[in-house]
Amino acid sequence: MKISNLDDWYEVTRGLYRYVIAAKVCYELHILYWEDGTDILAAKSSLYIVGDWTSIPEHTSFFSREILLAEQPVFECLKAAEKDYKENI
């Protein structure tokens, strides 16, 4: 599986893709606009990192969805996910 290949992402529902990277943590790709008959890699989308997290100093658990890239083509979001994964995971 490659994070840079959309075929390796799980389509949760039309226009919402998920790539699991750890227990309770994943990237989400939200398709915002995709014109019929065009390549999905050119569709306008946004990339998020989503998960259940724990803050050690405060001893609190929380859910968050943080945007990593907004309103860009899918291929750019895939590149951003790969870059974020290499740098932070």
Give short role names for the model-derived ranges.
Residues 1, 21, 25, 33, ...:
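Intrinsic low-complexity, intrinsically disordered segments enriched in polar/basic residues
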Residues 1-26:
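Negatively charged, low-complexity tracts enriched in Asp/Glu with abundant Ser/Thr
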Residues 4, 30-34, 70:
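A structural detector for beta-sheet-dominated domains
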Residues 18-19, 28-30, 43-45, 81-84:
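Polar/charged side chains located within well-ordered beta-strands of beta-rich proteins
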Residues 19-20, 39-40, 67, 77-78:
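Short, intrinsically disordered, low-complexity terminal segments
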Residues 27-29, 35-64:
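Short aromatic-glycine-(Arg/Gly/Cys) micro-motifs in beta-strand/loop hairpins
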Residues 49-89:
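Mixed-charge, Lys/Arg-enriched low-complexity segments
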